[in-house]
C-alpha cells in the first residue's frame, strides 16, 4: 500500500499473513501514516492522534509509543533532519515526504531509544520503506541511517560490527 493511496481506516488492520507482526512494527507503520498526514495536510498532531484513536486505527499498537513518535518527530523535525542531512545526495526539501518521515523516525529512535539495537532501528526503517516508499527507497534509507548510526550509536556500532 502506498501512502498516497491511503484512506482513513484502511490498511491498519493486521492481515492474516502478518499476524506475527510485532506491536512495535505495527506502531511504526501507523505512526508513519500519521506523520505523512501531519506533513501533507499540516494538521496538528493532537488532532491526528485523536482521529486515529477514534477511527480505531491504534488497535494492535503501543499507543504510548505511537504518541511519542508522532509528537517528538513532528515537534523536532528540523533537528532530526539535521542528523541525517549530511549523508544525503540532495537537499532535505527534495526528499519525498514518506522517505523523509521514515528517516526522521529512524534517527529519532537511534538518538532516543537506546534500548533498541541500532540494527533493529535500521531494519524496521528499511521495511517501512519497502512497504510504503518508492521503489528502491529502502536501499537509500538503509545507507543514510547506517551512516547516521555511526555518529549516534558509534560505541554500539563498533562493538557489533
From Swiss-Prot:
Annotated spans, Disordered: 1-22
Gene Ontology BP term (one): transcription antitermination
Assigned keywords, A-Z: RNA-binding, Transcription, Transcription antitermination, Transcription regulation
Entry-linked SUPFAM superfamilies: NusB-like
GO MF term list: RNA binding
GO CC annotation: cytosol
PANTHER family associated with the record: ANTITERMINATION NUSB DOMAIN-CONTAINING PROTEIN, N UTILIZATION SUBSTANCE PROTEIN B-RELATED
Described purpose of this protein according to its UniProt entry: Involved in transcription antitermination. Required for transcription of ribosomal RNA (rRNA) genes. Binds specifically to the boxA antiterminator sequence of the ribosomal RNA (rrn) operons.
Family: Belongs to the NusB family.
Protein name, as recorded: Transcription antitermination protein NusB
Higher taxonomy: Bacteria, Pseudomonadati, Pseudomonadota, Gammaproteobacteria, Thiotrichales
Amino acid at each position: 500500500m502506498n501512502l498516497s493511496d491511503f484512506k482513513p481506516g484502511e490498511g491498519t488492520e493486521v492481515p492474516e499473513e502478518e499476524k506475527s507482526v510485532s506491536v512495535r512494527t505495527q506502531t511504526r507503520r501507523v505512526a508513519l501514516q500519521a506523520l505523512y498526514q501531519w506533513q501533507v495536510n499540516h494538521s496538528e498532531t493532537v488532532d491526528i492522534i485523536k482521529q486515529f484513536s477514534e477511527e480505531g486505527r491504534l488497535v494492535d499498537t503501543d499507543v504510548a509509543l505511537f504518541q511519542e513518535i508522532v509528537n517528538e518527530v513532528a515537534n523536532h523535525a528540523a533537528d532530526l533532519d539535521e542528523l541525517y542531512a549530511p549523508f544525503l545526495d540532495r537537499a532535505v526539501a527534495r526528499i519525498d515526504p514518506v522517505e523523509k518521515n521514515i528517516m526522521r523516525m529512524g534517527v529519532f529512535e537511534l538518538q532516543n531509544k537506546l534500548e533498541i539495537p541500532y540494527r533493529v532501528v535500521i531494519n524496521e526503517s528499511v521495511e517501512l520503506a519497502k512497504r510504503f516508499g518508492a521503489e528502491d527507497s529502502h536501499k537509500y534509507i538503509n545507507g543514510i541511517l547506517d551512516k547516521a548510526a555511526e555518529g549516534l550509536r558509534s560505541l554500539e556500532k563498533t562493538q557489533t560490527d
